[in-house]
């Protein structure tokens, strides 16, 4: 199954969770914080402006992004993989380099 987001929505594959702290303590699954980074796997057509024009999104498929801890509250399971669906404005930054 393929997921195609609408308008200014973006589908993100969350990065792998860290299971150890910086000090080397292993965290159980429920205690580990979910990472706020991921890779864009699909983008919508763009944001519809008040005048009816469509503004293209600033992110593209393959971009590595950072989003807020409460962003992407819509999780969808596609082919056994959990994907996040969020509005483009919930993305804080694109990781370059």
UniProtKB/Swiss-Prot annotation:
Its main location: cytoplasm. One of its GO terms (biological process) is chaperone cofactor-dependent protein refolding. SMART domains: Cpn10. One of its GO terms (molecular function) is unfolded protein binding. Transmembrane segments: none annotated. The keyword Nucleotide-binding does not apply. It comes from the Bacteria. Belongs to the GroES chaperonin family. This is Co-chaperonin GroES. It comes from Pseudomonas putida (strain GB-1). The gene is groES.
């Amino acid at each position: 199954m393929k997921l195609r987001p609408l308008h200014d929505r973006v589908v993100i594959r969350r990065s792998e969770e860290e299971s150890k702290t910086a000090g080397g303590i292993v965290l159980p699954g429920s205690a580990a914080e979910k990472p706020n980074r991921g890779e864009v796997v699909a983008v919508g057509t763009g944001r519809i402006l008040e005048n009816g024009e469509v503004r293209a999104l600033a992110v593209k498929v393959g971009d590595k992004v950072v989003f807020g801890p409460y962003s992407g509250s819509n999780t969808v399971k596609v082919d056994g993989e959990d994907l996040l669906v969020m509005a483009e404005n919930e993305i804080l930054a694109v990781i370059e380099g």
